[in-house]
């Protein structure tokens, strides 16, 4: 990527990368739908159009019955699905997932990895950062970095 001004970099990042955070980063006063459509609203899309744009993603992630719930009314797995839906809402070129299963129980973690596999099969590239070797084994390609140095590549 060429050197860009900070504003240009922010616009590019918001358009091209969908971020999935370990601790969800949901806005507690927003309901599920508001959290999911937020990236589209930031881009200037109106609420009704943004909600329509996200309808399929909400269905895909099994959140139809939760759209009016606030984050404190959701399980960890549901919060992570909202985080994933929000990352997908702007149709980014790549998803960047930081420890996406780190705050989840085993069953919810497996559910997220299964969802990532489905999303990847649908053409969504995913770059996942994890310290959990079992989670890394779910990836098609693994790059291992130790002390800032590339030490191993698989796949």
How should these model regions be labeled?
Residues 1-145:
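ABC family nucleotide-binding domain
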Residues 142-155:
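H-loop (His-switch) and adjacent beta-strand-loop-beta switch element
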């Amino acid at each position: 990527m060429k050197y860009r001004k900070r504003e240009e970099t922010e616009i590019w990042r918001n358009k091209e990368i969908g971020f999935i955070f370990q601790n969800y980063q949901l806005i507690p006063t927003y309901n599920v739908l508001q959290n999911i459509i937020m990236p589209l609203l930031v881009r200037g899309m109106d609420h009704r159009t943004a909600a329509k744009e996200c309808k399929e993603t909400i269905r895909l992630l099994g959140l139809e019955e939760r759209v009016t719930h606030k984050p404190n009314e959701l399980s960890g797995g549901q919060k992570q699905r909202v985080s994933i839906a929000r990352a997908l809402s702007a149709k980014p070129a790549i998803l960047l997932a930081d420890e996406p299963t780190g705050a989840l129980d085993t069953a919810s973690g497996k559910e997220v990895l299964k969802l990532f596999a489905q999303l990847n099969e649908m053409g969504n590239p995913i770059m996942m950062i994890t310290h959990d070797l079992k989670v890394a084994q779910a990836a098609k390609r693994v790059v291992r970095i130790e002390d800032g140095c590339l030490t191993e590549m698989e796949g």
